[in-house]
């Protein structure tokens, strides 16, 4: 893979550099996210974005940017870049000669005879940003000015000039502290050497965020600066800026930075970059570990957690079994109520939990017995909830369920399959909505929900049998055959006998939806499949023909009249396209797993080609990571979250499949 590095020509081209974002995170939940030239293009961008427990634990942008100015002979050279209406000002990107992502995001500026290096990182376990400035070359006396711009607002919002903001700065050792509004933490801004802080509070107006404008959202913001630091800096000298929610000792900043840089791994190769990206999703907060679904706008979400967990934790060179178990334990102990995780209305989330357990089994000490001891009760609770039905007692209001014989919106029908339907609410992972209605409504029997249901029932019976739960086995032993028989009878389509496949969902009176979607492939890839080898081969072929791209699987065949090949524009446009052709990398795991299941070592070359195709893409969009989605049409440009846990997990799972296949060659 090309080293995660960019030269002056690339950095100076804003059409190129503003489309590439860097991300630095820590275990405490904080992160830094901006473009590789440090020009914010999203409301989610900022140097310090971190959870604020006094405001519900949501993420807030405290420090939006830090503008650097090099001063020589009373001439000022501003290294920052911002977009204002009709102009970029200042245009500090013209001074950038190099950007490197490893071991930590590093920018080198050339201003005449001055060569200045900037290294940025988040402290591993604290809400603390460190930026080290090193003057590599200078032909005359040099001063450095640092001006912080403060936001103190939700990452989902924008700030505007107001009378409530406290523009004062209060002295602390080595710097100042500011807090624009009550209930926020103090932002302690300190430097590692003696410096003057010049108090000069002022609002700067109409910062523009290009990506928000493209996405159809408000995109202008006002930011407050309380003043600036100014200090001399000598050739060969380093100065460290610290932004933190806790006051630190200035003389400790150098050692803290050195300790943090030493723990960074080199990320110049494809797999180390993926391993590093995977670890960025793990957050330790309130004494438990969670898995963030993606950056920069997602929090932890149960569906994404169960889909991605094994790939994030169990593919690392140093296995993270304890973290995997801790996350699963937390969900069972704190989020499972009456067989449903949290209050999320979803027919599939609980069933992905079983798949996560299946993948954990071979890594946890005690194997099947330990899985059953820890999770057997939860597994049975979920199955009983699905069998007996989840309905209006969990609805938010009386309109959230049918007032007829199907008032329980998720339940097992007489044929053993799971029926899921609620007016005005999507219940599967294809869950976007426009104008209060699902875009991709899939009511009734959804194919992947029932494949997951079959897998969950079979796996629970397997463990119950091994561990001696005879009563459960006796009660459920006939279910797998019943589900399997009716699964094929319900979903199998032979409109074209030469190319049969599965209906995406089946509604009233057996009406089969014939859209070619990737959900049917999940029925082939799970450890327990309700399909035989012939059926799996047919589905694999249809998937390869209509849905496979170099970046994942399309959510709908291009031959469909509803197909949308570009996922761009305002929220309505993006929601319309999201599951109508947009490509998702996480689905590739199921495609490759099915390929190995059907063709064994004969599939190795194609699997390698698919995985290798992502190497160069780590230089795009969210550098060093894998995005949430891509356009369905070539050239398959990235869209959605810049770094998405299920996407990264899928590629790491594919790498493990390839490695296992090679070991058995």
Q: Which sequence ranges carry the predicted segments?
A:
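Terminal accessory carbohydrate-recognition/targeting modules of carbohydrate-active enzymes
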Residues: 1-266, 303, 318-320, 329-333, ...
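Aromatic-rich carbohydrate-recognition surfaces in CAZymes
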Residues: 137-138, 159-162, 171, 231-235, ...
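Glycine-rich phosphate/pyrophosphate-binding loop
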Residues: 195-231, 429-446, 558-576
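Inter-helical turn/loop segments and adjacent helix faces that build the functional surface
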Residues: 251, 360-374, 459-477, 534, ...
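Acidic/His metal-coordination segments adjacent to aromatic residues that form catalytic metal sites
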Residues: 283-291, 333-344, 419-445, 509, ...
